[in-house]
């Protein structure tokens, strides 16, 4: 078979027409060392701080150290297959995670990949993990309550939507229990919740998922898990990933609550990464920017105004404010709140709930110390009825603590002192609350009203909890309309006070407990 010259030239012309002569520019570097999840790369002149670097085997690294002739990056995943001499490439992208409604009810890792065995997450939205917090001009003051359903918190240390309230205390004294109760209490309120587990056992996270599912709270919750077996890099970025997921709701005029459990372990992970990157250590071997590690995260929790939401959504959402409330958790060692990380986070947040081991061991749970606990902005957001009735509770407890110490040495006490001690004991007993037994505004108001107006004074201390249970049961069965009215309005006036008085006196008269 012979081809004519014209056929040959035709074939060549077709090949030339189909030839792709576009040039793809790649910034390429060589890996010179890999150890403990840290790679040092020679080259990559165009890399920027925080950029994702493509490594062999579909693994990415995060550029953290930019030196004159090399780049120090932390590997986000498995690094055993990476060896000296392998190539690394710039991507021109910073780390992003999937965000949106599709993540609700799911358990994801620090990169947003599902780890609950329920298939892929279908979402069209993604967001960078590092974002600049809204400026002062876009913020709105905190004036809406975020009810936790816990008597001692909502009455004495109220939390507002858009606030940062630290939960601080030693290990195993109920810090996570408070956060989980707060998430469960948001059921039916429209508040979306994100729970970020940092450096915890996988079994503990599985237990939390089970508890949330049992109480119907998983439907409005995203769980971001960086377990103890995950690399330090994933534990370091997990809070930022969770925060981006919460900002999705905040920026669209919705309310969100995020729990960081706990930021002590994130600081440990960041310290490990920094020391491996040969950054100079400072106090307690932490790097110099450990304050910025937490401040840039917690400043993203805010209440934003209508203009911000309208501008962000290009006019699709109008007249709505958005909020992201943060509950960071810090673990102390032997109650030492003057250590480096606790003092940093206390100075960043808008208040703290301080839990004490001695109170926990004495049976007071939640073990909140009302003297050390404070909410700097929550008072303006507190529900009116709880604010009015809760003031006497804090005063009664403060007087009780002072007199209790004095009464141990004094043998003869006058009637007024004895009365204050008796009331303090009963108020302390009233503030005990089991986990998963959060209260509505109306039921909490009933308990506070009974304590504030001396209805508990005639009871034995052991009768306080049974009386409260009977009071709540009576209110829900016989006075359901009053309960619904208080839950809806949250107001307090002479008429509401009279209704509360009727319910409490009815319960005392029946002695149903």
UniProtKB/Swiss-Prot annotation:
Record-listed E.C. numbers: 7.1.2.2
Domain of life: Bacteria
Record: residues binding ATP: 169-176
Molecular function as annotated in GO: ADP binding; ATP binding; proton-transporting ATP synthase activity, rotational mechanism
Localization in the cell: Cell inner membrane
Topology versus the membrane: Peripheral membrane protein
GO cellular component terms listed in the entry, alphabetical order: plasma membrane; proton-transporting ATP synthase complex
Pfam family, one: ATP-synt_ab
This protein's UniProt keywords: ATP synthesis, ATP-binding, Cell inner membrane, Cell membrane, CF(1), Hydrogen ion transport, Ion transport, Membrane, Nucleotide-binding, Translocase, Transport
Top-level EC class: translocase
Reactions catalysed according to its record: ATP + H2O + 4 H(+)(in) = ADP + phosphate + 5 H(+)(out)
Annotated site, Required for activity, chain positions: 373
Family: Belongs to the ATPase alpha/beta chains family.
Quaternary assembly: F-type ATPases have 2 components, CF(1) - the catalytic core - and CF(0) - the membrane proton channel. CF(1) has five subunits: alpha(3), beta(3), gamma(1), delta(1), epsilon(1). CF(0) has three main subunits: a(1), b(2) and c(9-12). The alpha and beta chains form an alternating ring which encloses part of the gamma chain. CF(1) is attached to CF(0) by a central stalk formed by the gamma and epsilon chains, while a peripheral stalk is formed by the delta and b chains.
Role summary: Produces ATP from ADP in the presence of a proton gradient across the membrane. The alpha chain is a regulatory subunit.
HAMAP family: ATP_synth_alpha_bact
Record protein name field: ATP synthase subunit alpha
């Amino acid at each position: 078979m012979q081809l004519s010259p014209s056929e040959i030239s035709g074939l060549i012309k077709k090949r030339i027409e189909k030839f792709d002569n576009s040039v793809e520019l790649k910034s390429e570097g060589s890996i010179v060392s890999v150890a403990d999840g840290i790679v040092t790369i020679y080259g990559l002149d165009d890399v920027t701080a925080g950029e994702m670097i493509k490594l062999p085997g579909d693994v990415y690294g995060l550029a953290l150290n930019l030196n004159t002739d090399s780049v120090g990056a932390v590997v986000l995943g498995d690094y055993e297959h990476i060896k000296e001499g392998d190539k690394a490439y710039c991507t021109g992208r910073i780390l992003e995670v999937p965000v949106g409604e599709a993540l609700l009810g799911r358990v994801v890792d620090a990169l947003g990949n599902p780890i609950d065995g329920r298939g892929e997450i279908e979402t069209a939205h993604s967001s960078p993990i590092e974002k600049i917090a809204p400026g002062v001009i876009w913020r709105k003051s905190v004036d809406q309550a975020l009810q936790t359903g816990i008597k001692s918190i909502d009455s004495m240390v109220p939390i507002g939507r858009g606030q940062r309230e630290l939960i601080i205390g030693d290990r195993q004294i109920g810090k996570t229990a408070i956060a989980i109760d707060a998430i469960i209490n948001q059921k039916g309120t429209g508040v979306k919740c994100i729970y970020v587990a940092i450096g915890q056992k996988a079994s503990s996270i599985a237990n939390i998922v089970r508890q949330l599912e049992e109480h119907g709270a998983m439907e409005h919750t995203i769980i971001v898990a960086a377990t103890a077996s995950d690399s330090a890099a994933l534990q370091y970025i997990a809070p930022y990933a969770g925060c981006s997921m919460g900002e999705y709701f905040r920026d669209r005029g919705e309310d969100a609550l995020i729990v960081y459990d706990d930021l002590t372990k994130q600081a440990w992970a960041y310290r490990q990464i920094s020391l491996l990157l040969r950054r100079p250590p400072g106090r307690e071997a932490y790097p110099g920017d450990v304050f910025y590690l937490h401040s840039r995260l917690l400043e993203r929790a805010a209440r934003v105004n209508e203009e911000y939401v309208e501008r962000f959504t290009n006019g699709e959402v109008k007249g709505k404010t958005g909020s992201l409330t943060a509950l960071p958790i810090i673990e102390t060692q032997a109650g030492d709140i003057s250590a480096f990380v606790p003092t940093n986070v206390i100075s960043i947040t808008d208040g703290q709930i301080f839990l004490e081991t001695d109170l926990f061991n004495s049976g007071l749970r939640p073990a909140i110390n009302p003297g050390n606990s404070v909410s700097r902005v929550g008072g303006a957001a507190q529900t009116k009825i709880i604010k009015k009735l809760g003031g006497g509770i804090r005063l009664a407890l403060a007087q009780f603590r002072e007199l209790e110490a004095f009464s141990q040495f004094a043998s003869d006490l006058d009637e007024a002192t004895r009365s204050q001690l008796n009331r303090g004991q009963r108020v302390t007993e009233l503030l005990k609350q089991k986990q998963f037994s959060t209260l509505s505004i109306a039921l909490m108001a009933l308990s506070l009203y009974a304590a504030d107006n001396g209805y508990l004074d005639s009871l034995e201390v052991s009768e306080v909890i049974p009386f409260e249970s009977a009071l709540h049961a009576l209110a829900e069965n016989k006075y359901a309309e009053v309960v619904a009215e208080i839950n809806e309005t949250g107001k307090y006036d002479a008429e509401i006070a009279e209704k509360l008085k009727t319910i409490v006196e009815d319960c005392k008269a029946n002695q149903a407990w």
